């Protein structure tokens, strides 16, 4: 199986793709019921619609689905050499600045920064990730805070959660610098 979430490329939440071999999809029972997924219902049993309908209970995401194709096109356009080069420069700048701060632990340090996706998961000594996220939000910066659906990983690193920042291809060097300055201010505010 392959699964892909549309919101990872800026499509609306609840969009995506599930790809599986027909023999497995045919053999799998639906995990929900309702809507057009049922062909017939009798006291003797239920016959499900063919795939993919048998897995599509209820009303489809009619507001989100139209965002999926434009998001794919935008993602394709973001692969131009100029955009990739600039985004890599922003990523490297942010990584270097975060690495210089001895209060910050970066998880997943890469051997080759060129291969690293533009996402940084960090913890900050004497500052709770949720407090930092709240202060950064007040500064106009969106980050993710918590266990990132990966509680065993948090246990492995001995933390209750992390702060995660993700860069987009349209983020600027100025925004990365603003983030570094704002994170420094937030750390000072919540660690006192």
Tell where the protein language model's regions lie, with residue ranges:
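Pyridoxal 5′-phosphate
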Residues: 1-192
């Amino acid at each position: 199986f392959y699964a892909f979430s549309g919101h990872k490329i800026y499509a609306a939440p609840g969009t995506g793709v599930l790809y599986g071999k027909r023999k497995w999809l045919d053999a799998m029972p639906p995990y929900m019921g309702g809507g057009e997924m049922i062909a017939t219902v009798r006291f003797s049993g239920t016959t499900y619609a063919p795939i993919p309908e048998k897995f599509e209970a209820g009303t489809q995401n009619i507001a989100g689905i139209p965002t999926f194709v434009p998001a794919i096109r935008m993602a394709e356009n973001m692969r131009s050499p100029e955009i990739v080069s600039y985004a890599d420069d922003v990523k490297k700048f942010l990584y270097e600045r975060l690495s210089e701060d001895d209060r910050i632990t970066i998880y997943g340090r890469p051997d080759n920064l060129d291969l690293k996706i533009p996402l940084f998961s960090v913890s900050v000594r004497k500052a709770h990730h949720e407090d930092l996220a709240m202060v950064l939000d007040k500064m106009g910066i969106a980050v993710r805070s918590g266990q990132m659906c990966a509680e065993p990983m948090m246990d492995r690193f001995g933390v209750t959660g992390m702060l995660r920042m993700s860069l987009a291809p349209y983020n600027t060097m100025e925004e990365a610098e603003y983030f570094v300055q704002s994170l420094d201010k937030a750390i000072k505010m919540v660690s006192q």
